[in-house]
Amino acid sequence: MKGTIIKGIGGFYYIKIDNSEEIIECKARGKFRHTELTPMIGDYVEISVDKNNKGAIEKIYERRSELFRPAVANVTQALVVFSFKNPDINIDLLNKFLLLCEYNNLKAIVCFNKMDLVNKEDYKDIISMIEQAGYDIIFLNAKEERNMDIIKKLIKDNVTVFCGPSGVGKSTMLNKIIGKETMITGNISEKLKRGKHTTRHSELIYVDEGLLVDTPGFSSLDINFMEKEDLLHCIPEFRDFIGECKFTGCLHHREPNCAVKKAVEEGHIHKNRYDFYIKTLEEFMNRRKKKW
């Protein structure tokens, strides 16, 4: 039998069988330990069931994509959920999420939730920065279901991961999409202005001919596994200027006659995005120096 892993808890994996509502609990065969291949949420697998009705994962099919934090396979797009207020937006964190989406070849769609709390005009520079980078934006008020119909259309025929900092309303959005509360949503802590971490595990849910992944909340991202060469290819605004710099292998940092720096000066690339790139690049370079 074949199916998709929709949940994994404590070494047990729950597989939804193709063309069926049946879900079978399985363990992974020991052979996967020798290949260092660990089953992930979203994996398409082949399983066997013995006479005692015990399931085992026999084969993991090739993954189209692979995320490690959160650990999810075969995702096609990411809804990057933030709010301008409650909690206040962290631009560097937003840029890190977008960076990871690019690294993993995921289409990223930025969703600003809790729009009832703010005046959009007060944040037009941030909005302009995201649009200039080529990302679509959806403005939401999930509690009142504002524009949630757009989200539902996007989900069809995709494997979609919800990501973003804690407290911005990811679980509320998920609850509205599937029409019932599958997860307990936490109130914002007045002291920390952060949501309580009430999403306890990653789970894949079938909704309207699409698949959704909701993951445990987190407020920071580690991108230290990336190299500076990766970074160059994860800022989409830079791509139009590839090959136009004086020096081959230009890092768009201190090099003269740099087409990217010129584009920033002329307003073709938003300065905040370039500043984030330089800050991240220097962190990578300093990390490499420490290794030596």
UniProtKB/Swiss-Prot annotation:
Organism: Clostridium botulinum (strain Loch Maree / Type A3)
Cofactor note: Binds 1 zinc ion per subunit.
InterPro entries linked to this entry: G_CP_dom, NA-bd_OB-fold, P-loop_NTPase, Ribosome_biogen_GTPase_RsgA, RsgA_GTPase_dom, RsgA_N
Alphabetical keyword list: Cytoplasm, GTP-binding, Hydrolase, Metal-binding, Nucleotide-binding, Ribosome biogenesis, RNA-binding, rRNA-binding, Zinc
Enzyme Commission code(s) on record: 3.6.1.-
Family: Belongs to the TRAFAC class YlqF/YawG GTPase family. RsgA subfamily.
GO cellular component terms attached to this protein's record: cytoplasm
Single biological process term from Gene Ontology: ribosomal small subunit biogenesis
UniProt domain CP-type G: residue ranges: 64-221
Name of protein: Small ribosomal subunit biogenesis GTPase RsgA
Molecular function in Gene Ontology: GTP binding; GTPase activity; metal ion binding; rRNA binding
Residues reported in the UniProt entry to bind GTP: 113-116, 164-172
SUBUNIT field: Monomer. Associates with 30S ribosomal subunit, binds 16S rRNA.
Function: One of several proteins that assist in the late maturation steps of the functional core of the 30S ribosomal subunit. Helps release RbfA from mature subunits. May play a role in the assembly of ribosomal proteins into the subunit. Circularly permuted GTPase that catalyzes slow GTP hydrolysis, GTPase activity is stimulated by the 30S ribosomal subunit.
Residues where Zn(2+) binds: 245, 250, 252, 258
Places the protein is found: Cytoplasm
Required cofactor names: Zn(2+)
Main subcellular localisation: cytoplasm
Domain of life: Bacteria
